[in-house]
């Protein structure tokens, strides 16, 4: 067998004619129902009792044939006239409630010529012409299942015959622990769990035509590891398959980490809303977990749960022909929903924020929470349904209300259902709160901006010249922003007004000089310059004025020694010629009558000290007695000068010369 194949494919087929028991008056025959992939032989099981194997009446021994086909397709070797349309589905009274165990199969039946059904069991079927390999045990795993769209399209396009109503149920063996209510709506289990009283079947057993084809066409609970294997539990109640009035749900395969697998031996369940599906028909009576189970609502979902939620609303083709079941309100009892579940329903799903819709009934918050969490697992479409719900057709799927279509999950958990419910109410409350507190920041900023604008308008009232920048420096008229202006210094001028103040020459783009705050051209500016008193040239650079004349700094020198007098003291003679101090004293200072040198100021001093006696000039050091040479005092005392006959004498020498003249 090829390991890459999804399941074991049979190369031959059986042509089986099934006859009804003797207590059924009209003989009815049904076509063999081939389950979806994997294609395994449901009529050859090691543990299968012989009473369940149908007998062959028309086909003799050695005519066993099998074929590979689809559900509902007629075998090529069988006459189509032998198959009669199935009767209507069984009523609700003839089926046991979901809480009880699965009813045992009806008694074996055979042809009318073989005896009554109460007689012994039928003889075993003749051996096939070939040896078929036994299917793998339940411990072995098959490859991953094919895409869900392929399986759904195969089962959706072909009609499935509905079996006749089953006989009244017989006393059932000891019932196993009742299944948890959340099992029918949960994702497929990792591995089928059976009660301890019965061994786990290796593969699906062929049920009698009264019940088995219906269970195979209504509910598929495949194993996650096996590719789309039909695994009905004989002792476990089918979710809602036998009741046409109950909601029909189809749980596609999903990866094991995201499935909910209740164990009959475990008292508590682990409920995760990632695999909870919502159908518009059964929304009010959604199954709830027990209070003992931890309820977790993850905010982020992964891709496998999104695929499971998209295809969860899909139904089987057999459910299309049935009338949609009536919607059971939250206060009533739905099929398969016990009163213990209603008492143990947790209140965590009924969020008080969803009650903002005043016109909604009491059970609506639960429906809105379910829809919101279901929509968060899969992508939304324009009509508010998941892609899986759109693929099943519109016969048994009711359109969602307008409030549920626009519902989207929010990060903070607040529902925004519809355009006229809680969103507007919350906005109104916020507006009232802001109004009671006063102005908000936006209104305060607008008020402040208007106030500042009004103050600026009051300070600068609008005038005709408001658009002009400044006034012209010559004519005093306003300068427009559109015309060309000339900036000279700190003033602006019109082009026509910016001319030389003497010759009226245009100065735009030319070199100009400013004299007394007025622009001048180069020639007019040169005319305003002074000439040097020494070289008689225009002084264009630094100007030095002395003795009422203008000089170049290099031309102002001493008249005797020609040294520069810039920054030096000088003395002007009678001819108004500048002289340095030394040359002036040497030339014009008085001379000493003793030494004959000019009497000039001492070095480092500006003052000249001289002694005048007998109309003669003396240096301070040269003022002495002529006879004895002692220094004379400038004061009138005994140490002073006592002149005699034009001589400068001290008192002692004066006495001597006077006595000598007398003697």
From Swiss-Prot:
Cell compartment(s), UniProt: Cytoplasm; Cytoplasm, Cytoskeleton; Cell junction, Focal adhesion
Entry annotated with the keyword Metal-binding: yes
Tissue expression profile of the protein: At the early gastrula stage, expressed at a low level in the animal hemisphere. Expression rises by the end of gastrulation in the anterior part of the embryo, where it gradually increases by the midneurula stage. During neurulation, expression continues most intensively in the anterior part of the neural plate and around it. At later stages, intensely expressed in the brain and at lower levels in the spinal cord, eyes, nasal placodes, within somites, and around the cement gland.
InterPro entries: Znf_LIM
Extent of Pro residues compositional bias: 122-148, 160-211
All residue ranges annotated as the LIM zinc-binding domain in the record: 470-531, 532-589, 590-660
Lineage: Eukaryota, Metazoa, Chordata, Craniata, Vertebrata
PROSITE patterns xrefs: LIM_DOMAIN_1 (PS00478), LIM_DOMAIN_2 (PS50023)
Molecular-function annotations in GO: DNA-binding transcription factor binding; metal ion binding; transcription coregulator activity
Alphabetical UniProt keywords: Cell adhesion, Cell junction, Cytoplasm, Cytoskeleton, LIM domain, Metal-binding, Repeat, Transcription, Transcription regulation, Zinc
Family, per entry: Belongs to the zyxin/ajuba family.
Skewed-composition ranges (Polar residues): 298-314, 377-393, 427-438
Residues of the signal peptide: none
Basic and acidic residues bias locations: 342-353, 360-375
Gene3D superfamilies (alphabetical): Cysteine Rich Protein
Protein name per its UniProtKB record: Zyxin
GO BP of this protein: cell adhesion; integrin-mediated signaling pathway; regulation of transcription by RNA polymerase II; transforming growth factor beta receptor signaling pathway
SMART domains for this protein: LIM
Keyword Nucleotide-binding: no
Domain of life: Eukaryota
Summary of the function given for this chain in its UniProt record: Adhesion plaque protein. May be a component of a signal transduction pathway that mediates adhesion-stimulated changes in gene expression. Suppresses the transcription-repressing activity of hesx1/anf1.
Pfam families: LIM (PF00412)
UniProt main location, coarse: cytoplasm
